[in-house]
């Protein structure tokens, strides 16, 4: 299990460069905690560590998961809970660094999200070409062996799991578990 200091260090790296004042001014710690916990399954809610975007601990947990409220720059909801592998993934994605998973990683977004391109990890809005998807409650999985993803569809409208961001270092499996 990752120790708390290393977890906070990774989280600090993950959050570098984000503006926090807007979200902090609009949301109380209780609201941010509730938002972050809405991403977690019921069996983990009392076990996860929850951090706000200023790295303040809103809840200290003893599991391998760290949850965050919706990022301040996003409209709508998009809280997520990440294990250690996903924390590394998020750091790489946010800092546009190469990434190769060392282990299987699982991330929860059980409150859903407000949308992302299925093909471009850095798209900021919907276009006709970028397969914009507003996903309901879902899990995300990364794997060290990307060839395992070849058996899965890339079409987000196939009615089941699909591969997002194929042919990028940030490729992962999306597993919808509820209505969009």
Where are these regions (language model features)?
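Primary mode marks residue(s) on the alpha4-beta5-alpha5 output face of response regulator receiver
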Residues: 25-180
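Bacterial N-terminal signal peptides that target proteins for export
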Residues: 2-10
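Classical cleavable N-terminal Sec signal peptides
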Residues: 6, 23-25
